[in-house]
Structures are given as C-alpha cells and as structure tokens.
Regions:
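Bacterial Sec-dependent N-terminal signal peptides
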Residues: 1-25
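N-terminal targeting or regulatory segments adjacent to alpha/beta-hydrolase or S9 domains
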Residues: 17-94, 102, 138
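Glycine-rich active-site/cofactor-binding loop and its immediate structural neighborhood
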Residues: 87-146
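Cap/lid segment of the alpha/beta-hydrolase catalytic domain
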Residues: 120-121, 127-222, 232-233, 278-281
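Mobile cap/lid helix-loop segments that gate and shape the active-site cleft of serine hydrolases
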Residues: 204, 208-211, 226, 266-309, ...
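Alpha/beta-hydrolase fold nucleophile elbow
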Residues: 236-248
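C-terminal catalytic histidine-bearing segment of alpha/beta-hydrolase fold enzymes
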Residues: 292, 338-380
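Short beta-strand/loop motif that positions the catalytic acidic residue
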Residues: 312, 319-321
Length: 380
C-alpha cells in the first residue's frame, strides 16, 4: 500500500503539468493573436517612416530611443584595473587571459590575442561569442582556452566542431594580423550561476533583472560597448581601427554594437538577421521565436531589427545568413537585407553594405570566417 501511495504522489505533478482546458490563448509559447500583433507593428522611428528627414538627426534620435528602451546601464568603473592572469605563446602571436573591472558592479575575464609581427599597434576585433543554448563556455568558443580545467578545454574544442567547422575563429584572425578580444556575456562562462548551468533559469533571471528596472539583454550590449572602449585604451591596439564580429547571438551583438558605438568602424554578422514578422509568427514552424537574449522592452514599438542595424550606416557592414538556417527563415533575412540596403543606398554608400545568403545551416564554418577576415582586410 505504501508503494502505491508513493507512485501516485509521483504521478500527480505530471498529471497537473499536462492538464488542458478546451479554450486557450497561447500556442507553442506564442499568443494565438500573434499575427494581429505583427500587423500593428508600424515602426514609426524607422528611417523613411519617421518624420525626421535629416539622416544625422535621425540617427541621433533613433539611437537615443534605443538606449532609452535598454533602460539604465550598469555604472561605469572608476578604472579598468586590467590584470594579466596568464600568457601562452602561440604560433606567431601571444594569448593572454585578462581580468578587469567592467562595471562598478562586477569584474569580468577575457581572452586577448596579440600578433607578434613587429608592429606596435594593430587593428583589433571585438569577437562576440554565440548563444547556442550552451552557457557553460562563452569566450572559450572564440579563442583556444588555456590554464583551464580539461573539461572546459574539451568542451571548447567540441563546440568548434559543432558550430565553427573545427577552427577557432579568434586564433585564425590573430594569425591574420589582428588583435582579438573576447569576453563572456552575462550568464555565460565565468559569468554564470553559482549553482551551475540551467538554461531554464535564464528567463527567470532576465525577469528578475527587469524587476530591478534593468534589462539583461541590454546589459550584454552595454558590456560590449564598454569592452570596446577598454580595447581602445590598450597599447597594442590602433584605436581608430576597431571592428567587431560574431555568429548567431554573437552576430546580433555585433550589429547592435556597430549601431550603437562610434568606436566600431566595421562590423560582420554571421547568421543573425531577420524581421520580426517572420521571427514572431507560427507560420514557419520554428521551435524558438527569440528570447530574452535579444529582448529589449518596448523597442519593437519604434523599430525592427534591420532598422536598428541601419544605425551603423554609413559604416562598412557584412551580413551572412544561411539558406538552410532553421532559426532565421530566408524570407525574413531577405526582407531585412532589403530594408538595410534601402538605408545605405539612401546615403549614397550602398557599396559599403554587403549581404549574402550562403548554402549552409546555422553556424560559421572556416569559409565564412575567411570571408569575414577578407572583409576586414579590405575595410578596416
């Protein structure tokens, strides 16, 4: 009898979880009226739809609105207080692990690669890691880790095979003559949970941040802006030649950073561009329709993704999406690319925006990494 009671108690939570009512309002984590919401998105602050006709004034106004929607930033530190935790000699460049005060609230660790080619200063890339639903590592996805636990090192190499074709993007760029910098985003790597990785807690943490009047996604962007400012102060870096790049969430970070930081001169984004009407509909059978990693409250009342990315105009920008990418349907990428081309063309600099659709799934193989480096070679 005791065993029967225990079994019944074990079954009850499962039964409660699967309870359904005849009527409902949400389906596949989306409101059933999602297409009506999409129809009401008018984007009044987009270039060409705004009543501001001077491009510089529009950029200033639109950027100010983006920052307003990003809510309060983390307070700046009094000093960076950069400490070199370790160094490793590599083939033609040196790897360093740094720790620095990124905000008054927190210290952050990063990897930096410096070419040893006789030059005192180099062009630099803020290389921004992906999401991948894999939070155990962050910066280690971009640069070969060292002085780390073997579990972390193995995880980093496994991730390269899965997403980057077995080539560490940062180390490849360092061999091509670039200073490369990569830091963890909030919740990734050495900025994760004390209790360990649990992606199901991400949304709860993001919600708690909003209760503080802060935005977790915005903190990621604010941090990327701040690390770019730090990068400009380092003696090995030519402060007038800083670019940024990333894949997936790293691509989102790259075009957001390009749009919001004047320090960035050139940007490249691989596999993250779409329009909200394609991202937030049930039509394409997607299992995920965005999330807190790119959720900035109220911003969609004013601009869509390509409108925000267009704040990077007239900078040279490269966008690559995959035709087999299940996360970003081709119609959404094509619509976004067309909108951005309209903006760059309106300013007489259409040749500075390059958008490409590749016959590939979601990821950044060595061929795409090479394409990005060639773009930087030409424009940075």
């Amino acid at each position: 009898m005791k065993k029967i009671v225990i079994l019944l108690l074990a079954i009850v939570p499962l039964a409660a979880f699967s309870q359904k009512r005849a009527l409902y309002e949400f389906k596949k984590n989306m409101p059933v009226y999602c297409d009506s919401l999409i129809a009401d998105m008018k984007y009044p602050l987009a270039w060409g739809q705004s009543d501001i006709h001077d491009f510089s004034q529009w950029k200033e106004t639109a950027r100010r609105k983006v920052f307003e929607c990003m809510m309060t930033p983390p307070p700046a530190p009094q000093a960076w207080n950069v400490v070199v935790l370790g160094e490793e000699q590599r083939d033609g460049y040196v790897a360093r692990k740094l720790e620095f005060q990124l905000s008054k609230y927190y210290k952050v660790r990063a990897y930096m690669l410096v070419p040893q080619d006789g030059r005192k200063k180099h062009p630099a890339i803020n290389l921004l890691h992906d999401h991948g639903a894999h939070l155990f590592i962050g910066k280690e996805k971009m640069i070969i880790p060292f002085q780390e636990d073997s579990v972390i090192i193995k995880d980093a190499f496994d991730w390269q095979l899965k997403v980057y074709g077995g080539q560490f993007w940062g180390d490849y760029m360092a061999r091509r003559g670039y200073v490369v910098f990569s830091a963890d985003a909030p919740l990734w790597g050495e900025r994760g949970r004390e209790e360990g990785v649990d992606r199901s807690k991400y949304d709860m943490i993001a919600g708690n941040m909003q209760m503080y009047g802060r935005c977790l996604s915005a903190f990621m962007t604010y941090d990327d802006i701040a690390t770019t400012e730090l990068l400009a102060t380092l003696p090995e870096v030519d402060a007038d030649r800083i670019g940024c790049a990333g894949c997936s969430m790293g691509a989102y970070r790259a075009w957001m950073l390009s749009a919001l930081s004047d320090r960035i001169k050139v940007g490249a984004a691989v596999c993250w561009m779409v329009t909200s009407d394609v991202q937030l509909t049930l039509k394409y059978g997607r299992s995920e329709n965005g999330g807190f990693a790119n959720c900035i409250p109220a911003l969609r009342q004013y601009m869509d993704y390509p409108h925000i990315a267009s704040l990077a105009c007239p900078k040279p920008m490269l966008f690559i999406n995959g035709m087999k990418d299940k996360l970003f349907p081709v119609p959404g990428a094509e619509k976004a690319f067309a909108e951005m081309h309209r903006v760059w063309d309106s300013q007489g600099v259409g040749e500075r925006l390059v958008t490409e659709l590749w016959d590939m799934p979601h990821g950044c193989p060595p061929e795409a990494q090479q394409r990005v480096v060639e773009f930087f070679d030409k424009n940075l």
